[in-house]
Amino acid sequence: MNHDEAVRILKSGVERNVVAGLISIGLNESDRIWAQQTCLKYFASSNESVLTSAITALGHVARRHCELDKDIAFAALEEVKTRFPSLEGVIADTLDDIEAFT
């Protein structure tokens, strides 16, 4: 899906749409800064599916663009790990992507 479509479905607020939009952003978005900011915005979600998608999408952004604001990403991931210890595996995978590709 393109940028405008992703924005539209994120605005819907429907869980499955938000999840699909975030993953699409991670895999397709050409604007790295916007993609990173959007993923990080959804780190505030209390919905585990949305949060997992935002974390995974951030890893995709790092892998695809080979660049990321690491300090902000690391701090945000640590905060999420504190709130949702059950997501430690997903967070570890994303940290691996950030370390390997940026």
Segments and roles (model prediction):
Residues 31, 63-64, 100-101:
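Alpha-solenoid helical repeat scaffolds
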Residues 13-14, 46-48, 83-85:
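Short inter-helical turns and helix N-cap capping residues of alpha-solenoid HEAT/ARM repeat scaffolds
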Residues 74, 78-102:
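Eukaryotic acidic, Ser/Thr-rich intrinsically disordered low-complexity regions
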Residues 49-75:
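Mid-chain, well-packed structural core segment of small domains
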Residues 1-9, 30-43, 66-81:
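Amphipathic alpha-helical scaffolding segments comprising HEAT/armadillo-like alpha-solenoid repeats
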